Amino acid sequence: MLDFNEKTATEGVLKSFSSIKNERLKELMSSIVKHLHEVVKETEPTFDEWLNAIEFLTRTGHKCDDRRQEFILLSDVLGVSMLIDTINNRKSKNETE
C-alpha cells in the first residue's frame, strides 16, 4: 500500500481483499474493516490503548481450547450473538407471536 494515510487506509485494506473468493465473507470483512477504521478515527486511541485492546483479545484467545471457545462468550457479552439471532428470526408484520 503506497501513500498510506488516514484518507487512503480503508480503501487500501479493502483492495487487499480482492482475492477472497467467498463473496459473503468479503462483504462481511469489508464492513468490519470500514467500521473498525471509523471507530479508530472517532476515538483516536494511543498505541498503548490499542495495545491494551489487542492484549485483551489475546488473553481471550489464550483461554480457548478444544472445549472452550471464549470468543463465543465475548460475542454473547457484547450482545452480538443475540443481535444476530434477532436479525435471523425477524417476524413479518403479518406474523403473530
Feature-to-residue mapping (PLM):
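Feature of secretome-associated and extracellular-like proteins
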Residues: 1-96
